[in-house]
Amino acid sequence: WVIGKADSTKSKTRKTKPIWAGIELGVNSYLDNKGDFNLADGKENFELKLNKSVSFSLNFLQKNVQLGHSNVWFFTGLGVTWNNYRFDDDIKLSNGNFTNAYHDTTAGVSHQKSKLVASYLTAPIMFEFFTSRKYKNAFHMGVGGTVGLLIGSHTKNKVEIDGETKKLKDFGDFNLNPFRYGFRVAMGYGRLNVFADYYASTLFKDKKGPVLYPVNVGITLVGL
């Protein structure tokens, strides 16, 4: 290598690598124990407004390992994910021995909006295949899973109390599972990437809340 001369060993075209580090936006939902999005059997109050139930992820660390000289990569990393579950009905979540959704009947109090926010430290364990080694014309598909550690949670309610509008936050674990794990599939072309997550762990602890399996679909906006 000589100063002022190009390094001939480096390709002028950026090679492919898995897309994880960056920003993700998604939509949250969940399935009941029958695999149904339409909730019944006492879970109706947990129905969501999908257009308001958004997720945001900031994935700040990524480690790639190419399998030999193939177009297959293994990768892992770290990120922080914020999951917003905006309830279709204006309810409150109990924060006791069992998490339930109920209507507040306190006189003079009118609920207008209600949501649960849960944040996780997230790590992928994925394999990704590319049809080319160049970003601009590479179709890619990834399969694997993600694991997450709960690092914060709260509810947010917009209420009207005696004619005055207030936003109330209640911090607690709401019997959320402290650890989650699930499956991820991802595909895309070039720098564009879409993904879908299904969690095999329930949103709430066993026998501490309704049986709900989180689902998340979205897009990677920036691959760093």
Segments the model singles out, each with a brief description of its role:
Residues 1-28:
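N-terminal targeting leaders of membrane proteins
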Residues 8-18, 65-72, 132-138:
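Short loop/turn motifs that connect adjacent beta-strands in outer-membrane beta-barrel proteins
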Residues 17-19, 50-56, 117-121, 137, ...:
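Residues that define the transmembrane beta-barrel architecture of outer-membrane proteins
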Residues 17-19, 27-32, 38-97:
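Glycine- and aromatic-enriched membrane insertion/assembly motifs of diderm outer-membrane
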Residues 23, 27, 56-64, 78-80, ...:
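Residues on the lipid-exposed face of transmembrane beta-strands in outer-membrane beta-barrel proteins
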Residues 28-32, 81-85, 148-152, 197-203, ...:
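Structural signature of outer-membrane beta-barrel domains
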Residues 34-38, 43-51, 85-118, 150-162, ...:
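Extracellular/periplasm-exposed beta-strand and loop segments of Gram-negative cell-envelope proteins
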Residues 171-224:
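Predominantly the C-terminal beta-signal and adjacent terminal strand-loop region
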